[in-house]
A protein has these predicted regions:
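Transmembrane-helix boundary/entry motifs in multi-pass membrane transporters
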Residues: 2-5, 35-39, 64-93, 111-117, ...
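Extracellular loop-to-transmembrane helix junctions
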Residues: 4-5, 32-59, 216-229, 326-333
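Hydrophobic, membrane-embedded alpha-helices of multi-pass small-molecule transporters
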Residues: 5-24, 43, 90-94, 98, ...
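Transmembrane alpha-helical segments of multi-pass small-molecule transport proteins
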Residues: 8-15, 44-49, 86-95, 111-135, ...
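Hydrophobic alpha-helical segments and their helix-loop junctions in multi-pass secondary transporters
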Residues: 21, 95, 128, 132, ...
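Juxtamembrane transmembrane-helix boundary signature
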Residues: 45-71, 233-237, 241
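Membrane-water interface regions at transmembrane-helix termini and the short interhelical loops
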Residues: 61, 101-111, 125-146, 209-212, ...
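Membrane-interface interhelical connector segments
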Residues: 177, 238-261
Length: 355
């Protein structure tokens, strides 16, 4: 029973990180999936399968190496020299996602509560900085605690959309602008790469903290399945009111508003919480890559990177997403391919599995 409890904790932490950059606002799902109609569900399945299988493998690798950061995992996948190159590209890209999420938090505070964007982003940075002063187990608990709430809200919104939505499933392709199978399939891979790249470093570290490979692998597997279900549900909900949400900055708030003003308020809080999850997880991974956690250098590092990310977030949420997200998708897919190749290579050689 204890191993299942630990696996579920890992799964919720995993989902909590990738959801922040993945679909907390709904805008990401709209751009990558919903606008391509019914075909988008093929992309959703592809993305979910990437997160499920690859997440399981990477969590097990993290446990095998007792990893505190992703360096040893990348060296295992790519070799020392190429692994180092991928390491620096990934960690700098993850920092760019951190900046993007801080900008998104500022925008969410502004649109939901009328708080100035600069102040909303500052509040988020202060909360993240304080949490980073705690040990990693506390961070895992912080990451996981909001995920069940998000799951309930997404299911509630999707269920309401099933009965109240103005667009039936059979009519979706007639209202979307770009019902395209090819692009939907590519976006499934690209989005899966994006979500995996965002969660990679944190999942390796969480796997390194797990007691056994079986537990960490199960946690990654459960996390991927939960992510697949959530992604499919939110895509369905967006389709059910597509004509109303297609031009919205934060589509999920529009959907919540059609159900209840109270739900809109609660969802706003949860959206900020999952953004916090992502910023927190990525900031820790960045600091842990260059320092030993909870040393003087670590505290100095977080005292630099958090204020710097806040300053750079003034570039703007939409502008950052347009540049950072496609790039992260490609980087993530590169690592995904390496994990798959390594898996089948070791299987063909009949070697003892690290993952």
């Amino acid at each position: 029973m204890k191993k299942y409890s630990e696996a579920i904790k890992i799964a919720f932490a995993y989902v909590g990180v990738v959801v922040g950059a993945g679909f907390s606002t709904g805008q990401e799902v709209l751009q990558f999936f919903s606008q391509f109609g019914i075909y988008s569900y093929i992309g959703v399945v592809i993305s979910g399968l990437i997160l499920t299988f690859i997440g399981r493998q990477v969590a097990k690798i993290g446990t095998a190496f007792d990893a505190e950061n992703h360096e040893s995992t990348l060296e295992y996948l790519f070799g020392k020299k190429l692994g180092l190159v991928i390491d620096y590209v990934l960690i700098l890209s993850l920092y760019a996602v951190t900046i993007t999420m801080i900008a998104g938090a500022g925008s969410t505070f502004n649109e939901s509560f009328g708080v100035p964007t600069w102040l909303g982003a500052l509040i988020m940075c202060i909360i993240v900085y304080i949490t980073l002063l705690m040990d990693f187990n506390k961070i895992v608990r912080a990451l996981g605690v909001v995920t069940p709430v998000l799951i309930v809200l997404v299911i509630l919104i999707a269920a309401a959309s099933l009965f109240q939505g103005s667009i039936p499933f059979s009519k979706i392709n007639s209202v979307v602008e770009k019902p395209n199978l090819g692009i939907a399939i590519w976006n499934g891979f690209n989005y899966g790469g994006l979500a995996f790249a965002v969660g990679f470093s944190t999942l390796v570290a969480i796997g390194g903290d797990a007691s056994k490979r079986l537990v960490s692998g199960l946690g990654g597997l459960i996390g991927g399945v939960v992510y697949l279900v959530l992604l499919g549900l939110i895509n369905f909900a967006l389709h059910s009111e597509y004509t109303e949400i297609k031009d919205a900055a934060i589509p999920t708030l529009v959907l919540a508003g059609k159900i209840s003003p109270i739900l809109t308020f609660v969802l706003s809080i949860v959206m900020l919480a999952v953004m916090y999850n992502t910023i927190l997880g990525l900031s820790y991974s960045f600091a842990a890559r260059f320092t030993s956690p909870y040393t003087k250098r670590y505290y100095l590092m977080i005292s630099i990177i958090v204020p710097l990310a806040y300053a750079l977030s003034f570039v703007g949420f939409e502008g950052l997403i347009a540049v950072v997200y496609p790039m992260m998708g490609v980087i993530g897919l590169f690592i995904v391919v390496a994990v798959v190749v390594k898996y089948f290579y070791r299987k063909s050689q009949d070697k003892k599995f690290i993952a």
